[in-house]
Structure formats: structure tokens, C-alpha cells
Curated annotation (Swiss-Prot):
Similarity section: Belongs to the tubulin family.
Superkingdom per UniProt: Eukaryota
Cofactors, names only: Mg(2+)
Chain positions recorded as GTP binding sites: Q11, E69, S138, G142, T143, G144, N204, N226
Protein name: Tubulin beta-1 chain
Length: 445
């Protein structure tokens, strides 16, 4: 069966990952000891996408947990579902990366990476037909960004034909945890552009906004934010785990969403998001789901899709609904907002329908969009990067770990190229496409 191997790294990655497993266990009826306690055969039918069945009927997540310090791992282990993970799959160092990308990528992380790869290999060998990897990490710190990208590039070498999906938490515009975030993020994007197949871009500020505005939470915690992320993560793979009328998998997703290989950074959204008090006053309909799903306030990263154009998008619906209605709604969105879609990719929205809704909801939908407006985020990080790099501020922390300034310059120009590519396709029209083809050929030559 099409298994997915889940990897989480660093503090942020481990906290998101822990929440994700709570959601997945809940959907498949697995209790915190790993025993099945559900009531529907459908929960077990394709449970092996994310779980390995061990002796005594226990289900063990196909998860690898890594960090350069033991703290977060301990809290995952003592958390509600901490006991279902395989103890050997916790790989951690003692020193920490101290928010330093170079430590995670070159020094501390490099020492630990082989033991992580051993665990990954062992898990991959347990798979019948491994479909790919999903990695949770943040790009602002040291471990998730530095060691996370190191692991991604190593896995790329060893499993070149498997899908590599990342859930990457970008530094947010107004909320900054560390001063050197722009450095860490730029160096990471440099890696992700080359080595990942699909990146779901998340950021804390957008998630906070959703919690404040839509969910009406007075004081959102990281737990609330991570819950939003895990709902989306579960939606991305629901087609693999439950039967549906229109299925999609990681590869179909990539084929439908990525028109040019470098442009694989997606915005994600989830619907229905309603505040706890007002849930019972809303009837869920496909039009309503669609409307909320495309709403810019619903996007989990701080870029406004109205400032750019969608190259492609994908909508995954869950629950009992008519596919005809889904198709009509999707067409409707495209016709009414045609200026926000590039016209040189006709029918650029893919939809899929899965019959089983998430627990507690009649129907739900997950949105993944490849929009040129995501350049706003890269541009913002790039400006912060340039401001510090021009003065060579904080560089000694990185050069001290053996990095070269050259690497910073390369990462910076790669990020700026990415922004320029998004801009180019945002401005492109169907008529002047021929010119681009000539340019592409020249570039290729």
C-alpha cells in the first residue's frame, strides 16, 4: 500500500507533529496505547499508510522524531500520545543548535544525521510500496531548518524517485522569535527549492489571525495553531487513507500543482473554520465550504492571494456530497474570479472527494494553492536578510561553524531568482507565451 513516512525535526516540527498524530489517531480510531478502538472497517482499510501493525495488534506510527536537544522530545513522549511511537525512532542530541542554521546543517546536525538516516532506512524497509516522505519543521530556528534540510537532501540522494513533501513554518512578518530568522530561512529555502517536491508554507502570524478573527479565541496558544496545521495535514492525505470518488495522492498532487519545477511553494487553507460557540448555527454546504476555502483570510501564510494570480490550485473535499456540485462550485469560482487565475493554464483547479469527513464534522475541505503572491513572503524575508547581511551582522556565528560568506550570497540570489520567477509568470499572458519559450530555450542551451 502507498505508505508515507513522517519525519519531524526541531522544536516546532515536533510540536506540530505530535498534534498531527493526535488528529490521525483520532480519525483512525487508535487510542493512546496504539490499540484500535474504532467502530468502522473503513478506519482500518488503509491504516497502513501511516501505521505499521506490530505484534499484539498494536499500531505504530511510521514516524521519525529528531532534535538536537532532548527537551521537546521528552514533552512529546510524556504527551497524550507519547507512548505509541517506537522508542528507537526518537533520535536526539544533547547540545542544541542554538537557532544556528550552520550548527544544524554542518556541525551538530551532521554528527547526528547518520543515526537519523538509519532509522529512516529501517522504516522505509518496513514499507510495502513507499510513496514518499512528509517533513514537519520550521525555517526560523537551527534544527528544523539546518538539520531538516540536511536530512531532506540526504533522503533525496537515497530515494530520488520518492515524493518529498514538507510542512515548513516560515518566519512571520511581525512576530519574530529570533533575530537571525532571515538568515536561517533564506539558507533553508535555498535547499528546499532544490530538494523538496512540494512545500506547504505556513506561518504563525497568519495562523494567529485565523485564531483571533475566525475562531474568536482570545488568547490562542501554539496548541491551537498546531491544531489548525494538523487539520490541513490530515486533509492533504485523506484520499490515501479513506476511500473516495476522486482520489489523489502526493504525486498526483504534484503533477497537477507544479507547472515549473522550482515553483513548488503552496499556500494552504482549511474549511470550515467556525468559532466554538457558533458551530450549531451553520449548515454546511458545498458552496459555503468553497467560499470559505478560497477566502484570503483563510490562508495559513502571510501572503494575500489577491495580490497575485493562481497558477494552479487543488481542493480536497471530505464528506458525503455530490461530485457534480463540487465541480460546479469549482467552475463557478474560476469563472467569477477569472482575473486571479493565469489564463495560459486552462482548468487549473483540481478537485478530489473523499467520503469520510474528519471527526465531528459533516463535511470539510482542504485547499492547496500555487499562487504567485507567495513571493511577498520570500521578498519580505529577503529584505530582512539583505539588511543584516550588508552589515555582516551575526555572520561570525555561521562562519565560526565553517560556513563561507559565498554560501550566503548564493542563497540570497537563489531566493531573489525565485521571486523573479513568480513575478514573471504573474505578468505572463497567453499571447506573449512564445517569447518566454524562446527565452527558456536560450536558458536551457
Amino acid at each position: 500500500m502507498r505508505e508515507i513516512l513522517h519525519i519531524q525535526g526541531g522544536q516546532c516540527g515536533n510540536q506540530i507533529g505530535a498534534k498531527f498524530w493526535e488528529v490521525i489517531c483520532d480519525e483512525h480510531g487508535i487510542d493512546h496505547t496504539g490499540k484500535y478502538a474504532g467502530d468502522s472497517d473503513l478506519q482500518l482499510e488503509r491504516i497502513n499508510v501511516y501505521y505499521n501493525e506490530a505484534s499484539g495488534g498494536r499500531f505504530v506510527p511510521r514516524a521519525v522524531l529528531m532534535d538536537l536537544e532532548p527537551g521537546t522530545m521528552d514533552s512529546v513522549r510524556s504527551g497524550p500520545f507519547g507512548q505509541i511511537f517506537r522508542p528507537d525512532n526518537f533520535v536526539f542530541g544533547q547540545s542544541g543548535a542554538g537557532n544556528n542554521w550552520a550548527k544544524g546543517h554542518y556541525t551538530e546536525g551532521a554528527e547526528l544525521i547518520d543515526s537519523v538516516l538509519d532509522v529512516v532506512r529501517k522504516e522505509a524497509e518496513n514499507c510495502d510500496c513507499l510513496q514518499g516522505f512528509q517533513v514537519c519543521h520550521s525555517l526560523g530556528g537551527g534544527t528544523g531548518s539546518g538539520m531538516g534540510t540536511l536530512l531532506i537532501s540526504k533522503i533525496r540522494e537515497e530515494y530520488p524517485d520518492r515524493m518529498m513533501l514538507t510542512f515548513s513554518v516560515f518566519p512571520s512578518p511581525k512576530v519574530s522569535d529570533t533575530v537571525v530568522e532571515p538568515y536561517n530561512a533564506t539558507l533553508s529555502v535555498h535547499q528546499l527549492v532544490e530538494n523538496a517536491d512540494e512545500c506547504m508554507v505556513l506561518d504563525n502570524e497568519a495562523l494567529y489571525d485565523i485564531c483571533f478573527r475566525t475562531l474568536k479565541l482570545a488568547t490562542p496558544t501554539f496548541g491551537d495553531l498546531n491544531h489548525l496545521i494538523s487539520a490541513t495535514m490530515s486533509g492533504v492525505t485523506c484520499c490515501l487513507r479513506f476511500p473516495g470518488q476522486l482520489n489523489s495522492d502526493l504525486r498526483k498532487l504534484a503533477v497537477n500543482l507544479i507547472p515549473f519545477p522550482r515553483l513548488h511553494f503552496f499556500m494552504v487553507g482549511f474549511a470550515p473554520l467556525t468559532s466554538r460557540g457558533s458551530q450549531q448555527y451553520r449548515a454546511l454546504t458545498v458552496p459555503e465550504l468553497t467560499q470559505q476555502m478560497w477566502d484570503s483570510k483563510n490562508m495559513m501564510c502571510a501572503a494575500d492571494p489577491r495580490h497575485g494570480r493562481y497558477l494552479t490550485a487543488s481542493a480536497m473535499f471530505r464528506g458525503k456530497m455530490s461530485t457534480k456540485e463540487v465541480d460546479e462550485q469549482m467552475l463557478n469560482v474560476q469563472n467569477k474570479n477569472s482575473s486571479y487565475f493565469v489564463e495560459w493554464i486552462p482548468n487549473n483547479v483540481k478537485s478530489s472527494v473523499c467520503d469520510i469527513p474528519p471527526n465531528g464534522l459533516k463535511m470539510a475541505s482542504t485547499f492547496i494553492g500555487n499562487s504567485t503572491s507567495i513571493q511577498e513572503m520570500f521578498r519580505r524575508v529577503s529584505e530582512q536578510f539583505t539588511a543584516m547581511f550588508r552589515r555582516k551582522a551575526f555572520l561570525h556565528w555561521y562562519t565560526g561553524e565553517g560556513m563561507d560568506e559565498m554560501e550566503f550570497t548564493e542563497a540570497e540570489s537563489n531566493m531573489n531568482d525565485l521571486v523573479a520567477e513568480y513575478q514573471q509568470y504573474q505578468d505572463a499572458t497567453a499571447e506573449d507565451e512564445e517569447e518566454y519559450e524562446d527565452e527558456e530555450e536560450e536558458m536551457a542551451a
